[in-house]
Amino acid sequence: MTIISDVYAREVLDSRGNPTIEVEVYLESGVLGRAIVPSGASTGAFEAVELRDGDKGRYLGKGVLKAVENVNDIIAPEITGLDALDQVAIDKIMLDLDGTPNKAKLGANAILGVSMAVAKAAAEALDIPLFQYLGGVNAKQLPVPMMNILNGGSHADNNVDIQEFMVMPVGAKTFKEALRMGTEIYHNLKDVLKSKGLATGVGDEGGFAPNLSSNEEALQIIMEAIEAAGYKPGVDIKLALDVAATEFYDEDEKLYKLTGEGVTKTAEEMVDFYEALVKKYPIVSIEDGLSEDDWEGWRVMTERLGDNIQIVGDDLFVTNTERLKKGIQTKTANSILVKLNQIGTITETLDAIEMAKRAGYTTVISHRSGETEDATIADIAVAVNAGQIKTGAPARTDRVAKYNQLLRIEDMLGFTGQYIGNEVFYNIKK
């Protein structure tokens, strides 16, 4: 019933109009599992390799026909005839087939597409939701959404250095209420921007992307929008930042160049900057506040801010257990951002989450800036009781698909579902 009978990959488009890979896994019972792989704009240097064709005459070199070929010609023959319920074994076979530490041979996009589609086919065959298949009977916690309502950095074409300004509806009682609160703030933010004569075009993840005089002005405008929506900053709503500092770090000079503000800072000065913002605004989480290789700077930031706010490693850890292990040993950061395509298989993703939780780190399940209608990350967030999800603004179908899936999951869980709000920050003083 759960034996794989066929595997097929094709090239499709993501939300930025770039090619990505879709994989279909068919079982002997006729069941189909289908998955589409996302793609990032600000990518960590230590991420698994996303295989692109490089043929400038086709999709400006961004085609993925080679990855598609690797699935159809190399991976498919090896896993056809295997049981889709053997997720760990199938993922291991693909890792062995690739044989490189960063999936450079077959491509993380090829491997992940198959890994996700196998899991979906298995869940479908058992007639249970994906979150329940991956997480078992204890998968019950709906995540607090980190809603990216204002964009800068490489996710937008403006002069704001910080990549994402997010609201977290920690005061909600249910996920449904949290989504409503965040959405109302988003619409009020549009009105606030209009009233100031600022642009209301959106970035890759659906957040607004106006030109502002400073990074702090973005926070001030969001505070206005929260109050205009009738909510109390710091009580109903907390703020989160994704700085993506690697994007403006000068490796040679060891300096952070915030070109939007026309200033240059050392790691210590960046931490001073964050400390001042945290004192002034209800910021509960800062992601990638320093460069992915500035381990000493990260240690200082964790030492100074880690008791009071969530310090999230994205480019720092790239969902990789080896880099996470180093972070745990050196007391660097206190939270990990989890992106499936940074590491490339369901199994390795779950391993990273387990390692983080055992060390007392919080986990944030995340989308990529180049997304699709695939909502797998919504199921994974509930499967592992992550407590937090980052999947953009309540706009653009590629983002809303994940929120709508979480609404469905909340309905499926009924009274057993939990939304714990502020309690997701279990390792800091709230």
From Swiss-Prot:
Its cofactor is Mg(2+). It catalyses: (2R)-2-phosphoglycerate = phosphoenolpyruvate + H2O. Gene3D superfamilies: Enolase-like C-terminal domain, Enolase-like, N-terminal domain. One of its GO terms (molecular function) is magnesium ion binding. The gene is eno. Catalyzes the reversible conversion of 2-phosphoglycerate (2-PG) into phosphoenolpyruvate (PEP). It is essential for the degradation of carbohydrates via glycolysis. Belongs to the enolase family. Its main location: cytoplasm. PANTHER family: ENOLASE (PTHR11902:SF1). Binds a second Mg(2+) ion via substrate during catalysis. The lineage of its organism: Bacteria, Bacillati, Bacillota, Clostridia, Peptostreptococcales. The keyword Transcription does not apply. This is Enolase. Keywords: Cytoplasm, Glycolysis, Lyase, Magnesium, Metal-binding, Secreted. Pfam families: Enolase_C, Enolase_N. Pathway: Carbohydrate degradation; glycolysis; pyruvate from D-glyceraldehyde 3-phosphate: step 4/5. It comes from Alkaliphilus metalliredigens (strain QYMF).
